[in-house]
Amino acid sequence: MKYWLTSFIILLGLLLFSQEKRASDSYFDLNYFSGNIALHNNDILHLITGHPEGIILSWNKKTFGNEAWEQRFNYPDYGVSFIYQDLKNNVLGNNYGLYAHYNFYFLKRNLTLRVGQGIAYNTNPYDKLENHKNIAFGTHLLSSTYAMLNYKKERLFDRFGLQIGLSLIHYSNANVKAPNTSVNTMALNMGLNYNIDEEDSEYNENLNDDKFTERIKYNIAFRSGFNQSDIIGSGQFPFYILSAYADKRLSHVSAIQLGVDVFFSNFLKELIYYQSVSFPEENVSGDEDYKRVGLFAGHELFINKMSIETQLGYYIYYPFDFEGRTYMRIGLKRYFGNKFFGAITLKSHGAKAEAVEFGIGVRI
């Protein structure tokens, strides 16, 4: 009941805030959700004690084809979201998250897919004295991603509409600090949407999408950050990655990549030493090299000045065994002009995250 009361108060405030004359081409939506924590790792079984619930409050800006990319992606929305989640376990605590998101439309704009990325705050992370059972979250600040698939109807009652659907919310600190088994919530959501304007603007349908390609371009990127092995208390260490790759633009929205990564992962120095003295049966001498080299192929999906980058790699130089020879990378890239870019990416081995990477680069 308290979630519905909170939701009503928030929505009432938004209605009062939205009483303006000029067109804003935006709307608010408010969803209540309830679901289950997915058992992706048996180690978190003791943390699953109830059905998590919470609210998702969002502001959304509509697009009407004023720019070519808006028409190519069927007039998506973009906006910001706030998520409050009660994980129904005192050990886990509660999460508060702030996200940027896109909404993509299908089936005559009745079906929406939202993808959001942001930062969440956990109220009760791991502490070796006060909260040693919380092996899901090793830090207050978490990386969080959520996806929402809704059947939505707008303007059913004046400016009010309804939506119902499914949500997936992921929380992890990406091995910035151990422990980090993470939490995934699968939930059913339902809620209201409210359009600020009395009526929508007209859609532009003047796209002349001629074939577009570019010659092969060459990229150099530098990525860095901090991470830790799975050994609690082993310490956080900086890492550095140099990447060189070629890309071929296939269309306005798509490009393919082929390149090489060189990894300088300082946390492996500590892990190599730890295994050499603690687990002699694993035949680790302590002199193994902490560096790795990988070859990768990738794809880039362009959305305005942003892009979604996905890569699959294989270590060709792999002197110390850590999580297997294949790796993946997914993240967001932002272009500044035609040559320079910044990126935030997640590197993982299957479902096991290794690091959040912050990168800069040049394309020539």
Feature annotation, model-predicted:
Residues 28-32, 78-80, 113-117, 147-149, ...:
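Membrane-embedded beta-strand positions of outer-membrane beta-barrel proteins
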Residues 66-68, 109-111, 155-162, 198-201, ...:
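Repeated loop/turn-to-beta-strand initiation elements of outer-membrane beta-barrel proteins
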Residues 61-63, 104-106, 151-155, 194-196, ...:
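Residue-level signature of outer-membrane beta-barrel architecture
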Residues 26-45, 66-72, 92, 107-160, ...:
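Outer-membrane beta-barrel translocator/channel fold
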Residues 48-51, 86-95, 230-237, 250-252, ...:
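Solvent-exposed loop/turn segments connecting transmembrane beta-strands
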Residues 57, 184-203, 353-364:
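Outer-membrane beta-barrel "beta-signal"
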Residues 32-38, 61-63, 82-88, 117-123, ...:
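Transmembrane beta-strands of outer-membrane beta-barrel pores
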Residues 19-67, 202-247, 363:
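Short glycine/proline- and aromatic-enriched beta-strand/turn motifs that initiate or cap beta-hairpins
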